[in-house]
A protein has these predicted regions:
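Sequence-level preference for short, compositionally simple segments enriched
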Residues: 21-342
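Bacterial Sec-dependent N-terminal signal peptides
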Residues: 1-21
Length: 342
């Protein structure tokens, strides 16, 4: 009997230990478990049944970060004072590398990742204000040189096979294009809440299924703020709810090159936004499902433009705006708001 009781106690203690959340602390001054974010990531196993927490204390971490592991929460102490920053132009990177792995400040391949209370910055365009530079480029087979412009692609976040990504109360910024690039057109599910995003052309450009709520978008340059690729599945969509848009005089809202599906609900636009609807860029791509751009209760400071008048009734299934939420986007595949926090 005693042996049986001891065995039960041992099992319960083991379960409790297994259920405990792994937590490591990053502190650039050396007062934590690790000085760099990458060291903390590298210290953990590739996977785990529950999220591992990497708590990052205030500071500026000038490093490029790679995450190929699953089930991680990177949480900053303060979004304004916990800064991950690196300077890299995509065109420079691709001169010596065959793909985009490493092109961003934060590079993701793992899934079930949460980013919280962080600033993630690609500072290339902010640092290089001269306009353009010429570099040696082995990928250029003719001249072996390339001109890098300040407005070119500069990714703060770039994902690959990643799905079930949550970004909460973060600042993501670059001066150039494709600042926030969560790309997984066939299976990617991405959730953004209470974030600030800033950049150039297509600086928020998800592929797959994306939901952004109460986010602010700031355009520094370029012919569009938002972009979407939903070409792999007619159900994929990008939803922007209670979001605000501002930027340089005459900034344009959005565009697409492939099949896309936009829903803008209760969004607000600065007075200096251009009178230009989300538009299709002419290419050789075949658009199979037609134009799918929908608005509800969106307003510009001053006089409204007619093109964002309510048209949800024309969307498939004529959805009710009140029912457009994460569950409506991700269906039964994922509910980012109901999952237990570590």
């Amino acid at each position: 009997m005693w042996k049986y009781c001891i065995h039960i106690v041992f099992v319960l203690v083991s379960c409790h230990v297994d259920a405990q959340v792994t937590r490591v602390v990053v502190d650039a001054s050396g007062q934590g478990d690790y000085r760099t974010i990458q060291e903390a990531i590298n210290s953990l196993p590739d996977d785990a049944p529950a999220p591992r927490v990497i708590f990052i204390r205030k500071g500026v971490y000038r490093e490029k970060v790679f995450i190929e592991k699953n089930n991680l929460l990177l949480e900053g102490e303060d979004k304004d004072q916990t800064v991950l920053s690196f300077a890299i132009a995509r065109d420079t990177w691709r001169c010596d590398h065959p793909d985009d792995w490493g092109v961003a400040t934060l590079n993701l391949r793992g899934s079930d990742i949460t980013l919280k209370n962080l600033s993630i910055v690609n500072s290339y365009g902010f640092d290089n204000t001269a306009g353009q530079v010429e570099i040696v480029c082995s990928a250029d087979s003719v001249n072996h040189r390339k001109t890098i412009i300040r407005q070119g692609h500069q990714m703060a976040l770039r994902s690959f096979q990643t799905t079930r990504l949550k970004v909460i109360n973060c600042i993501l910024k670059a001066y150039g294009g494709d600042t926030v690039s969560p790309w997984n057109v066939s299976a990617g599910m991405f959730y953004f809440k209470d974030c600030i995003m800033e950049g150039g052309v297509d600086f928020y450009c998800p592929r797959g299924w994306a939901y952004a709520e109460h986010c602010s978008f700031i355009a520094d340059d370029g012919p569009a703020c938002i972009w979407h690729d939903g070409s792999a599945d007619s159900d994929s969509r990008t939803v922007l709810k209670d979001c605000s848009f501002s930027g340089y005089d005459g900034f344009k809202l959005g565009r697409y090159h492939r099949d896309a599906q936009f829903y803008l609900i209760h969004c607000s636009f600065a007075a200096n936004m251009a009178d230009q609807d989300i538009y299709l860029v002419p290419t050789t791509n075949i658009i199979r499902w037609g134009r799918r751009v929908y608005y509800y209760d969106c307003h510009r400071k001053g006089t409204d433009y007619s093109w964002y008048a309510d048209n949800l009734v024309s969307a498939r299934g004529a959805p009710d705006a009140a029912g457009i939420n994460p569950h409506w986007v991700f269906r039964d595949k994922w509910d980012p708001e109901k999952e237990a926090q570590p």
